[in-house]
Amino acid sequence: MNLDLGSTVRGYESDKDTFPQSKGVSSSQKEQHSQLNQTKIAYEQRLLNDLEDMDDPLDLFLDYMIWISTSYIEVDSESGQEVLRSTMERCLIYIQDMETYRNDPRFLKIWIWYINLFLSNNFHESENTFKYMFNKGIGTKLSLFYEEFSKLLENAQFFLEAKVLLELGAENNCRPYNRLLRSLSNYEDRLREMNIVENQNSVPDSRERLKGRLIYRTAPFFIRKFLTSSLMTDDKENRANLNSNVGVGKSAPNVYQDSIVVADFKSETERLNLNSSKQPSNQRLKNGNKKTSIYADQKQSNNPVYKLINTPGRKPERIVFNFNLIYPENDEEFNTEEILAMIKGLYKVQRRGKKHTEDYTSDKNRKKRKLDVLVERRQDLPSSQPPVVPKSTRIEVFKDDDNPSQSTHHKNTQVQVQTTTSILPLKPVVDGNLAHETPVKPSLTSNASRSPTVTAFSKDAINEVFSMFNQHYSTPGALLDGDDTTTSKFNVFENFTQEFTAKNIEDLTEVKDPKQETVSQQTTSTNETNDRYERLSNSSTRPEKADYMTPIKETTETDVVPIIQTPKEQIRTEDKKSGDNTETQTQLTSTTIQSSPFLTQPEPQAEKLLQTAEHSEKSKEHYPTIIPPFTKIKNQPPVIIENPLSNNLRAKFLSEISPPLFQYNTFYNYNQELKMSSLLKKIHRVSRNENKNPIVDFKKTGDLYCIRGELGEGGYATVYLAESSQGHLRALKVEKPASVWEYYIMSQVEFRLRKSTILKSIINASALHLFLDESYLVLNYASQGTVLDLINLQREKAIDGNGIMDEYLCMFITVELMKVLEKIHEVGIIHGDLKPDNCMIRLEKPGEPLGAHYMRNGEDGWENKGIYLIDFGRSFDMTLLPPGTKFKSNWKADQQDCWEMRAGKPWSYEADYYGLAGVIHSMLFGKFIETIQLQNGRCKLKNPFKRYWKKEIWGVIFDLLLNSGQASNQALPMTEKIVEIRNLIESHLEQHAENHLRNVILSIEEELSHFQYKGKPSRRF
């Protein structure tokens, strides 16, 4: 069957799926539209029902596409173009992995047809599609592939690469062979006419360049688009059925939603039949001019559901809450804990009368995944069913009607008030079908405190909140238009009691479509949890910003005398710096720490240190895999990136990672601006003198953070000390404009080193809340200061103010830094900003005492002493780049930057090695590093060593670190040499440190336990 490759189809719109019913068309045109719709439906039904049993499935696709290009487009070009493109994409994706069609001329012509029709104006995407075909082996035995690909390269003026490509086809004996030779001969004639002549040196270069061009890094866009929307599809039968018998609520933003949506084919067929049949013969034809639909919403957006309660003797009350989640069936009842557990995939419910065997379900899922590509992508919004609740608790549901034509009729019936008195049950229900062991909360007691002011986050506070909800109710009249449903941004009140109202129960206020399938990645139940939780956290009765982050509130704090000793809990200490350009640090006294709004007695910092090994066991299961290394091409010059910190470059890298960031368990994306960072800073500065602290509540996680103080402020970020509702201290890094790069790097480090104990020496990111204008990175908090703080502390202890750090302590910290650099370099991460104030002190106090002699393997308690490496905002992931890639700085360099940066030369790992030298120099000399360059081009320290230092050790270290990029035969990273020097230092410590190093560490450990920020700059020396 022949395809006209010269035909062109112009114009394409992605959001039309049927023939538009034009106004003023003739009856013959309507009949023609109806016939085309019926033919289209017949083809779609054959694709779904007959394709799997056909000997030649490509033949059906060809018939369908030729019918569209010859009949459909002639009647309606716009809709026909979309249908043609969708059909071609489905055909290419469905057939591409069938070995029979790899070198079928018909299949190759469809690829070329698609490229010429829809990608002709995009050279990058056209070339990427050809590269994808080449790597998949599609058409590589056919001359047509090389001819068309060479034409594309020729038009882009890659003349020699196009010639080499034709020669490659001839070497592979592609058919028809004689035609390919003629094409090659004609092309050589054209090159001679253009005076493009090859020489002996240009031929190998052309072949190497062609090999580089044939390496594809991402699949074509339409394939990535399909994978985004279909591979994460999950069947409704595999999750708790919370969507049955509920009305249509406001549709939640779909994190995994693509522009193409999988829809029910049966509903689509019925809709097409309905559109074609609704043409009255005696109807008056209207004017064909299009009118602007101001309030029309073709997607039939869902509407909020709420309850109106009339309690005798009280004002009418409206509760934005979906009670159909509590009573999904006549004989079933769930409490709020069970509902949240089911939403998160932690609670499985076996419906009565609905038995599905595992074999049947698995077979059905496999068939659906295989045929999913054949289904036209549409959005299906079926009408909602009336909610069903038990008779004893039946209440009226007020929601906007989806059918405007019947709004008047329903309005009269819905506004009727039915007064019913009952108590909403919140007791836990024990069910045998638990996906995990979930603890059952004790039932509420009637003797719970009813005090309106609760200052501690305790059982009494929980009972108080629940008791406010467990009261009699009745359904009053509808809410008036003038009623205020907004919330203020900031409120100051004297305690921590919060009302259980709309802004606090947002996660349960939405009604889901019972027929709508949730799109999610089938990886882990935890991933599905975040997806479904995010979709259920929107309500249309609140201001738009309340969807994403609750107002920041301030509370007046008072010191509480500890009565009950809280259990000791170990947590990892956190980042307390804002990264580079740290300017100021706000005073934090023991009074502010002890005046917690959450706990009676905050946990001592020395007892809140978590072993990273435990954390790594609980790490996310579906972190992105390490991207495979690029294929190294011999004699290829290294890639040099001029502006390595460019936001556009980072955005490009993040757009190509797989899986994408929004699938990370601790990544929470909000599709809205927040504009709260400056307001948060202002309120904190005003309220800290009154001992009132703002509270930040992230709705997608339910995490509450009380801002305790300001740790640091830079050019783009401010770091706050925040206390969680569990009493854990966290560092909250607020960055404007929003940034995700540091979170990505830290997530990659945690995943790639998940089996290594070195993670205890790297700060951990708990979560990232990303808004359009700013980002909130939640980090673990380290309370013992930085290496720079330790240096300044040692200087202050000296009488003349010029004290320096103990040499053995310098060696110990140097060894710990080398261990971290070795590991992150092994997994392709360059820190890029290594300096004293990005290294935190980690002197944990576990039960095991510190041994008298230094142990390099960490025994005798030495594994609990070390550093934290923080601030990965200027880091690089070398696995995203070709091997040997280097960077050129576009910022002004100084003595704190490596020699390559200052000389304007390319660099890579040299930045970390020079940074390590700078940290060591600061510890030894008590001042920032200064270097001079010798006549032979090598660098050395400007300041000489003291006579009593171990010059044989420090000389070797600085010579290697300062000149890491000088040796021509030195391959970076030079991990083996770093390990060799580290072993030298460790051997010296084991042989000579004896009790001295232990005593020094215990001494500074005691000093740092009382360490408090005094609001003075860190970088002072």
From Swiss-Prot:
Residues 569-580 have a biased composition (Basic and acidic residues). Residues 47-212 form the BUB1 N-terminal domain. Its cofactor is Mg(2+). It comes from the Eukaryota. Residues 289-359 are annotated as: Interaction with BUB3. Autophosphorylated. Pfam families: Mad3_BUB1_I, Mad3_BUB1_II, Pkinase. GO terms for molecular function: ATP binding; identical protein binding; protein kinase activity; protein serine kinase activity; protein serine/threonine kinase activity. The keyword Nucleus applies. It catalyses: L-seryl-[protein] + ATP = O-phospho-L-seryl-[protein] + ADP + H(+); L-threonyl-[protein] + ATP = O-phospho-L-threonyl-[protein] + ADP + H(+). Its EC number is 2.7.11.1. Present with 414 molecules/cell in log phase SD medium. Involved in mitotic spindle assembly checkpoint signaling, a process that delays anaphase until chromosomes are bioriented on the spindle, and in the repair of incorrect mitotic kinetochore-spindle microtubule attachments. The formation of a MAD1-BUB1-BUB3 complex seems to be required for the spindle checkpoint mechanism. Phosphorylates BUB3. Also autophosphorylates. Associates with centromere (CEN) DNA via interaction with SKP1. This is Spindle assembly checkpoint serine/threonine-protein kinase BUB1. It comes from Saccharomyces cerevisiae (strain ATCC 204508 / S288c) (Baker's yeast).
